[in-house]
UniProtKB/Swiss-Prot annotation:
Gene: ais
CDD domains recorded: HP
Species of origin: Shigella flexneri serotype 5b (strain 8401)
Protease found in the keyword field: no
GO CC annotation terms, alphabetical: periplasmic space
Pathway: Bacterial outer membrane biogenesis; lipopolysaccharide metabolism
EC number, as in UniProt: 3.1.3.-
Keywords: Hydrolase, Periplasm, Signal
InterPro entries listed in its UniProt record: His_Pase_superF_clade-1, His_PPase_superfam, LipoPS_heptP_Pase
HAMAP family: Ais (MF_01868)
One GO term of the biological process aspect: lipopolysaccharide metabolic process
Native organism taxonomy: Bacteria, Pseudomonadati, Pseudomonadota, Gammaproteobacteria, Enterobacterales
Main function: Catalyzes the dephosphorylation of heptose(II) of the outer membrane lipopolysaccharide core.
Protein name: Lipopolysaccharide core heptose(II)-phosphate phosphatase
Length: 200
């Protein structure tokens, strides 16, 4: 019972810290909360959270070639040239505050290309489990985190996975656009959703 209380207090303490950081971030990012009810977490706030414990950031892939009139990078199942530019820009901004992270993607051309352009040369590990968008994705995240408990993780996945996580974890309606992100962490074998990543 005592252990449970301590765990509960720790979780509450962490959530209070997160709310405070989100409020501070909100002063410079128009609002501390997104319209979907998720806390907004920008680069600087994310860097502060990463000092508390490793973070897991999930991104939707960049602009799909087969659903755009923009020029394709290569394969029709991949992303557009604009998508590569957007992914590189996001990666540069992200890496400025979180330079050390392990990089993963699902086994589709669009997520692999997005992760590759985001990372600018960082080693990419492709994991087909990251295409599974039910409770299975939590098992995959916990497994990846257990391999390097002290490392931050970036995952390129799909909109339906992120929509599922937001609804399942916080009962939030989240319809991510290209390269939108969610911030999570793993604590004592459980996966927690901290909020929506906003690139500012």
């Amino acid at each position: 019972m005592l252990a449970f209380c301590r765990s509960s207090l720790k979780s509450k303490k962490y959530f209070i810290i997160l709310l405070a950081l989100a409020a501070i971030a909100g002063l410079g990012t128009h609002a501390a909360w997104s319209s979907n009810g998720l806390p907004r977490i920008d680069n600087k706030t994310l860097a502060r959270l990463a000092q508390q414990h490793p973070v897991v950031v999930l991104f939707r892939h960049a602009e799909r070639c087969d659903r755009s009139t923009n020029q394709c990078l290569s394969d029709k199942t991949g992303i557009t040239v604009k998508g590569t530019q957007d992914a590189r820009e996001l990666g540069n901004a992200f890496s400025a505050d979180i330079p050390d992270f392990d990089l993963y993607s699902s086994n589709t051309v669009r997520t692999i290309q997005s992760a590759t352009w985001f990372s600018a040369g960082k080693k990419l590990t492709v994991d087909k489990r990251l295409l599974q968008c039910g409770n299975e994705i939590y098992s995959a995240i916990k497994d990846l985190q257990s391999k390097a408990p002290d490392k931050n993780i970036v995952i390129f996945t799909h909109n339906h996975c992120m929509t599922y996580i937001a609804k399942n974890k916080r009962d939030a309606i989240f319809k991510p656009d290209y390269l939108d992100g969610l911030v999570m962490h793993v604590e004592k074998g459980k996966v927690y959703l901290d909020g929506e990543f906003v690139n500012h």
